[in-house]
Curated annotation (Swiss-Prot):
Positions in coiled-coil regions: none
Name by which UniProt lists this protein: Ribosome-recycling factor
Keywords: Cytoplasm, Protein biosynthesis
A Gene Ontology term for the protein's cellular component: cytoplasm
Species of origin: Chlorobium phaeobacteroides (strain DSM 266 / SMG 266 / 2430)
Amino acid sequence: MNVRDVAQRTEPKMKKTIEAFQHEIASIRTGKATTALLDRVKVEAYGQQMPLKQVGNVGVMDVHTLMVQVWDKSMVSATERAIRDANLGLNPAADGQSIRVSIPPLTEERRKEFVKLTKKFGEDSKVSLRNLRRDMIHEIEKLEKEKAISEDDKNKGKKEADEMLHKFEKQLNDLIVLKEKEIMEV
């Protein structure tokens, strides 16, 4: 095992952290209709909590409206209730076997709350990235103690860990700035 092996094991984990962050912020409202808004909604169905995607299809009708096509007609009211109770500030209205979800414009105060939430998710992701870097450095130091690599290799490995961290933190910061712009856009 060498420094390259450690780096090759760490990089995919850092990529996964970025992907998890992207998934997390996709559900934050920006004032535009997007199916990701309802990703976290759980519906009480058949005696258990099920993701909305498992009880119906979600589609975008227009910029301010989502349409949820519920597969089982008996689940329409439970689905409508789940969307209303999800604390997303959305206004669902049953229409036969489907539900129209109106997305009201965001207030300035609500936009700022969503920006704060985005930054919080970003900070959590940065902590994860730093922990991965720390683990990588720890593994490299362990290799040096076991005499599997030289001190020069250890130093190069630490430098590579720092560079990898900076690369992924930059990606994360770019995503945060992009999401903030999206949220604050009126």
